[in-house]
Amino acid sequence: MKNINPTQTSAWQALQKHYDEMKDVTIAELFANDSDRFAKFSATFDDLMLVDFSKNRITEETLAKLQDLAKLQDLAGAIKSMFSGEKINRTEDRAVLHVALRNRSNTPIIVDGKDVMPEVNAVLEKMKTFSQAIISGQWKGYTGKAITDVVNIGIGGSDLGPFMVTEALRPYKNHLTMHFVSNVDGTHIAEVLKKVNPETTLFLVASKTFTTQETMTNAHSARDWFLKTAGDEKHVAKHFAALSTNAKAVGEFGIDTANMFEFWDWVGGRYSLWSAIGLSIILSVGFDNFVELLSGAHAMDKHFSTTPAEKNLPILLALIGIWYNNFFGAETEAILPYDQYMHRFAAYFQQGNMESNGKYVDRNGNAVDYQTGPIIWGEPGTNGQHAFYQLIHQGTKMVPCDFIAPAITHNPLSDHHQKLLSNFFAQTEALAFGKSREVVEQEYRDQGKDPAQLEHVVPFKVFEGNRPTNSILLREITPFSLGALIALYEHKIFTQGAILNIFTFDQWGVELGKQLANRILPELGDDKAISSHDSSTNGLINRYKAWRA
């Protein structure tokens, strides 16, 4: 990968000049000037997904200049480096190969001279055998009863991904009830344990090192709770499995290492749902549906790695994002799924994007003088319409939005889905084209209102429009299409990081807080006043101690 400051390229300078020409052009004008705009600025993927990016403040010239930037930053070389197993995560000296986990073609992928695919397939086969035993009821708990509940204990990538996918694929779930515990706040594990029976519960402890503070604290609390009923520690092996690489610690915990499912250093946490971390997904929807999820992601991987940049969906979305973030000064992007099953999708890619590209140092170790990752947020429609859409429509901040919806619902109740989709279509139209003062005034006249009253109301009912959106319309949310959609966003994030000359696959920003927490923890064990920190931290700790006493 080339380590080039993008702002020093001729393409960036050309984009800056182009922005000066485009900043006052409206989306309405762009549509008025081109009757074929939708056809030119939309694309389909496998007849399963339509991506419409026509309601953006872009022209063909904009995209051409953004493509020039991608070429000068050697995006094609970066893609090749990732897929070939090069150690592009240089700060940790690791390859980045979540694509290998879903490599359904089984073509060799080499890391350190070794094809990783046999090991990937071996773990998949092991998960298949284990999950079939649990789902079928063949696996028995310590009293001879079949498993009814599964509790996944993890945090970050070991929680967000599996939780998001099991919720998104809830129409495909079997009889097992899934629970997810992540927060070290004891309330989280306590509330879950109230719902389950130790005789019929399986705990999955998801920690690569088996030392993650939050996960192991919750795991030990779950173990203590279990043993209060089960008594004998040998029963732990029937009710706990591990997603880890630390066989010694797993065995010491009481888990049979035959029920330890491994993954590798080249699997980043926020890209790990495709690995053994996805065991909870398999237990929820079955192995065949998990393979479909992998297959959908693999199909998007092939699209990303082989399709020319001009028609490459992850690249196009990434470039449009850079355009807004760096030239228009947009600081956030909203992800708005119009599907209740997808209610954790925005939260998942909040981590996926912000932990990946929330960096202020470039690949040369220098502080950047441009914008890197945006703030990602969002909620399902139509809930968001009655919450924060006001600011998107009439606020002073530009918030580019991704609207996501399935054409076919899993729950065709009455006319619910038509009403949902009517809002989906209406919102992007309203954001793009707005409502002029003239239209508002005419509406008041048509209603017979007193013209003298117009000035008191009209300004507040005007919508400027010109708010950019992408619309992603899926035929239906299935394991395959969900896999493709997740991979689309993953590759968008990678593309932006490659072009912006940052390391996307490390996350050193999470370390300092953990280090300080480990120093503070012993200080909370007594009632002595603390004076070893700044006055604010001392004051907070001392008030905590006073109140808990």
Swiss-Prot record:
<dbReference type="Pfam" id="PF00342">
    <property type="entry name" value="PGI"/>
</dbReference>
<protein>
    <recommendedName>
        <fullName>Glucose-6-phosphate isomerase</fullName>
        <ecNumber>5.3.1.9</ecNumber>
    </recommendedName>
</protein>
<dbReference type="GO" id="GO:0048029">
    <property type="term" value="F:monosaccharide binding"/>
</dbReference>
<dbReference type="InterPro" id="IPR001672">
    <property type="entry name" value="G6P_Isomerase"/>
</dbReference>
<dbReference type="GO" id="GO:0006094">
    <property type="term" value="P:gluconeogenesis"/>
</dbReference>
<dbReference type="GO" id="GO:0097367">
    <property type="term" value="F:carbohydrate derivative binding"/>
</dbReference>
<keyword id="KW-0963">Cytoplasm</keyword>
<dbReference type="GO" id="GO:0006096">
    <property type="term" value="P:glycolytic process"/>
</dbReference>
<dbReference type="GO" id="GO:0004347">
    <property type="term" value="F:glucose-6-phosphate isomerase activity"/>
</dbReference>
<feature type="active site">
    <location>
        <position position="386"/>
    </location>
</feature>
<keyword id="KW-0324">Glycolysis</keyword>
<feature type="active site" description="Proton donor">
    <location>
        <position position="355"/>
    </location>
</feature>
<comment type="pathway">
    <text>Carbohydrate degradation; glycolysis; D-glyceraldehyde 3-phosphate and glycerone phosphate from D-glucose: step 2/4.</text>
</comment>
<comment type="similarity">
    <text>Belongs to the GPI family.</text>
</comment>
<dbReference type="InterPro" id="IPR023096">
    <property type="entry name" value="G6P_Isomerase_C"/>
</dbReference>
<dbReference type="InterPro" id="IPR046348">
    <property type="entry name" value="SIS_dom_sf"/>
</dbReference>
<comment type="pathway">
    <text>Carbohydrate biosynthesis; gluconeogenesis.</text>
</comment>
<dbReference type="InterPro" id="IPR035482">
    <property type="entry name" value="SIS_PGI_2"/>
</dbReference>
<dbReference type="GO" id="GO:0005829">
    <property type="term" value="C:cytosol"/>
</dbReference>
<dbReference type="InterPro" id="IPR035476">
    <property type="entry name" value="SIS_PGI_1"/>
</dbReference>
<keyword id="KW-0413">Isomerase</keyword>
<keyword id="KW-0312">Gluconeogenesis</keyword>
<feature type="active site">
    <location>
        <position position="514"/>
    </location>
</feature>
<comment type="function">
    <text>Catalyzes the reversible isomerization of glucose-6-phosphate to fructose-6-phosphate.</text>
</comment>
<dbReference type="InterPro" id="IPR018189">
    <property type="entry name" value="Phosphoglucose_isomerase_CS"/>
</dbReference>
<dbReference type="GO" id="GO:0051156">
    <property type="term" value="P:glucose 6-phosphate metabolic process"/>
</dbReference>
